[in-house]
Amino acid sequence: MTLSVERGGSHPAADSYDERARARLLPEPPKGSGLGERVRRERRSPFSRDRARVLHSAALRRLAGKTQVVGPGEGAEISGIPRTRLTHSLEVAQIGRGIAEELGCDPDVVDTAGLAHDIGHPPFGHNGERALDEFGAACGGFEGNAQTLRILTRLEPKIGHGETAGGLNLTRATLDASCKYPWPRRGGERKFGAYADDADVFGWIRDGAREGHRCIEAQVMDWSDDVAYSVHDVEDGILSGRIDLAALGSAAERRALAELASRHFGADRAACEEVAADLSTLPAVEAVRGFDVGTARTEGHVALKRLTSELVGRFVRIATDATLDVHGEAPLIRHSGDLVVPPRAAAEVAVLKSVALRYVMSDPERLAMQARQRELLHELGEALLRGAPESLDPVRAEDWAAAPDDAARLRVVVDQIAMLTDQQAVAWHARLPR
């Protein structure tokens, strides 16, 4: 197998990564500008180039049309500024970059993993994941993280030749950092990072890594994701009028939140109940009790932003300090060590996730809407399957023509649906013959 390896680095941490980490699966010619024959040395690191490729990708832009938590009809029109999967990914990338700079990882590797981590999400988020996993059962199901790998290494058009699709052709280090669940599907396991027909490229990415062990950059990305969505989903819930943190002052509500955290996130129930009580007494939390976006003045909005800033900083600092206490000041890269997240911090994050789950995601009207969304995706999938290849976009129609069997053709239809934004899925479904 021919590999492309780049040298040089715009950040000192890039020099700590060996040739295997810098390698790309497909060889690439020198980058041209179309301005003549003048040749200059590439000053960017390979990891900086990775970041640029993801940042400029259509797959990343599509995340602007995919809801994070609060969407149309759920209070977004009140606050007017709901988060999308794109804004969430930008926040994850920024948080991860800061942690990487503290720990000695290459910031571009972690930043890119943060940008890319949700690229595989289908319309309607985790609800869409569930529908596509059911619809695509005969070809191995669906998982957003496995779809991320597929997009980065195959579906996003950037590098390729002949019958070989290279996707964005990112470095091994960046692809490994993007693997939140570095294992294929095992039995009925819900979370996994690669489909069976992506096994070869997954094997290349993971070559030399301990089975099932995430590199430090992936661990930083994952913690940054937890921090971002636990804090910011609560912020969006407050802005939409669905969350009031005064609920943390109720012992009954704290017990209910601890139960949710235990059941859905594997957290220790007693620890969650304890930290929920402690969170309720934080001055930053007390300052936003009773927040109402319809009446809040500047002081109230400043208090809400102070809360999110303090919580993000709290979780970043706790994890970086604990990791440095264990590993010292030597740079941590690839598989040289693990991120240390103290149990108390993990419990606090689990409680915040449970706040959003209890007061936003478990709303009966939302659950009814989600059932309709799953039905829509099933109907759309069946219609595309019946009408393929004419029902597919031209690129996916090419994939359909090259597919060797029914399972591969089903995977093409799943790929097609997964690429759609929320509104595209609704529009495509509306065009179906009645």
Show where each model-derived region lies.
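Sequence-structural signature of the catalytic-core scaffold of metal-dependent phosphohydrolases
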Residues: 2-38, 49-51, 55-66, 94, ...
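Short alpha-helical catalytic segment bearing the HExxH-like zincin motif
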Residues: 110-115, 222
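Acidic, carboxylate-rich catalytic segments that either coordinate divalent cations
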Residues: 2-33, 37, 374-387, 398-434
